[in-house]
Amino acid sequence: MPSDVKVTSNLKGLEQLQKNLKTKLVAKLGIFASDNSRDDGGKTNAEIGARHEFGVLSEGLPRRSFLKDPIEIKRKELLETANKVIKANIAKEGGAEKIFELIGIAGEAIVQEAFESGGFGTWKELTDFTVNKKGGSSQILIDSSQLRKAVISKVEKGE
C-alpha cells in the first residue's frame, strides 16, 4: 500500500545557529578614540576616566570606578540579560552580532546607572575643598556629562 506521507526538513535555523556559534566577536565597553576629546580642550576623556577609574593617591584623588566595579556589582543582572539575549537571537540571521551589541548596550546602561548613583554608593564623597572649587556642586563625575557620554560599547572581531 503506497503512502502519501512526504518528509521534508528545514535546516535553515540549525545552519544559522551553527554559523552564529562559530562567529568570533567581542563586545567592548569603554572610552574609545572617537569619543575621547572634550569641549574644554584640556585632558581627554580617557585621561580623566583613567584617573578616576584607578585613582591618583599622590594627588589625593580617590578611586571612583565607573567601569570595572559597576560591571562586577551588577554582574548577575548582566549575565541574566545576556542569557535572555542569547536565547532570543542565537538562531537568527545576524544573531551573533545582535547578541554582542545588546550585551554591550546593557553594559552601557550599568555604567550610566553608576554615574547616577555614585558608583552604586561606593564612591567617596567629594571633599569640602572640591565642592567649593566646583561652585557648590557635590555631584561626582557628572557636572559636564562629557565623561559619561564618552562611555560606549562596540562589537569587534575577536581572535
Question: Each predicted region: which residue ranges?
Answer:
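Short, Lys/Arg-rich flexible segments
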Residues: 1-159
